[in-house]
Amino acid sequence: VLSSADKTNIKAAWDKVGGNAGEYGAEALERMFLSFPTTKTYFPHFDLSHGSAQVKGHGKKVGDALTNAVGHLDDLPGALSALSDLHAYKLRVDPVNFKLLSHCLLVTLANHLPSDFTPAVHASLDKFLASVSTVLTSKYR
């Protein structure tokens, strides 16, 4: 459960992300593909090379989804319902991959926002991404 302090930290951090959400999403995906090569199996039709248009496009989708989630911290299940359906029923993504991408997102954010990435902000963002992952995998059961 996100506390009011967590919500404040998440919104403040995401304000710093600003218009870079798609870029950071793509960077996190690329980091995930390099660090956890098995995740590439879900993207057999993608050009996974550095800076590819397909990775950038999917990164924008990730960034947009997270921006939407930040705007709906009090109703993540409602905000992410369609995305949860897509990943559970159509794409059938292994739930562990959400944890891997979350880790890569945290590394990416820490890299780009070092002075803002305090231990408290790190903890809040980690809880947020864990909550998003929980919602995205909730329909697997």
Curated annotation (Swiss-Prot):
GO-annotated cellular components: blood microparticle; haptoglobin-hemoglobin complex; hemoglobin complex
Entry keyword Acetylation: yes
Modified residues (N6-succinyllysine): K7, K11, K16, K40
Biological source species: Rousettus aegyptiacus
Family matches, as InterPro entries: Globin (IPR000971), Globin-like_sf (IPR009050), Globin/Proto (IPR012292), Hemoglobin_a-typ (IPR002338), Hemoglobin_oxygen_transport (IPR050056), Hemoglobin_pi (IPR002339)
TM stretches of this protein: none
Protein family: Belongs to the globin family.
Phosphothreonine PTM sites in chain numbering: T8, T108, T134, T137
Organism placement in taxonomy: Eukaryota, Metazoa, Chordata, Craniata, Vertebrata
Binding of O2, residues: H58
Its job: Involved in oxygen transport from the lung to the various peripheral tissues.
Tissue specificity statement from the Swiss-Prot or TrEMBL entry: Red blood cells.
Residues reported in the UniProt entry to bind heme b: H87
Record domain Globin: where: 1-141
Phosphotyrosine carried by residues: Y24
UniProt-listed Pfam families: Globin
Modified residues (Phosphoserine): S3, S35, S49, S102, S124, S131, S138
Protein name: Hemoglobin subunit alpha
Modified residues (N6-acetyllysine): K16
